[in-house]
């Protein structure tokens, strides 16, 4: 993951910090974390990143519009959820996902499978 820029979209501070530490230890550069839908949309507009970890519920607001934009723009990303499959809209169910709380090894494996480095 060395040098891979990962945009972290997560509203829970301790979870975002855990993701930041795990990915940083693996050599990734962290963009964010950002905690709201508005901040996520702004980061997509302004930030340079290779892939995204996206929580689908940001401060009680659905981040589905963010996911839809990432799909439309062709970005590589994984959905993060603590609510399981029923919380994911049907049109997003085929996307890579990880359950919260994150298992650090599972998170790294998922991002390697997404091949974020080639996304650059």
Language-model regions: role of each:
Residues 100:
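A Lys-centered signature of the CheY-like receiver
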Residues 80-81:
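Hydrophobic/aromatic residues positioned on beta-strands within the core alpha/beta folds
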Residues 33-51:
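Acidic, metal-coordinating helix/loop segments flanking the phosphotransfer/catalytic sites
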Residues 1-5, 89, 103-120:
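Non-catalytic signal-transmission and effector/linker regions of two-component phosphorelay proteins
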Residues 10:
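Conserved acidic carboxylate
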Residues 55:
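Active-site residues of response regulator receiver
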Residues 60-65:
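Acidic catalytic/metal-coordinating carboxylates
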Residues 13-32:
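Two-component/phosphorelay signaling modules centered on CheY-like receiver
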């Amino acid at each position: 993951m060395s040098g891979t820029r990962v945009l972290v979209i997560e509203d829970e501070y301790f979870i975002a910090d855990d993701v930041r530490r795990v990915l940083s230890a693996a050599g990734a550069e962290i963009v964010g974390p950002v905690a709201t839908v508005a901040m996520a949309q702004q980061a997509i507009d302004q930030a340079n990143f290779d892939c995204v970890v996206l929580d689908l519920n940001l401060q009680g607001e659905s981040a589905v519009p963010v996911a839809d934009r990432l799909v439309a723009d062709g970005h590589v990303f994984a959905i993060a959820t603590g609510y399981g499959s029923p919380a994911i809209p049907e049109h997003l169910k085929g996307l890579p996902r990880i359950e919260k709380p994150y298992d650090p090894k599972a998170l790294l494996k998922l991002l390697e499978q997404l091949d974020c480095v080639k996304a650059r």
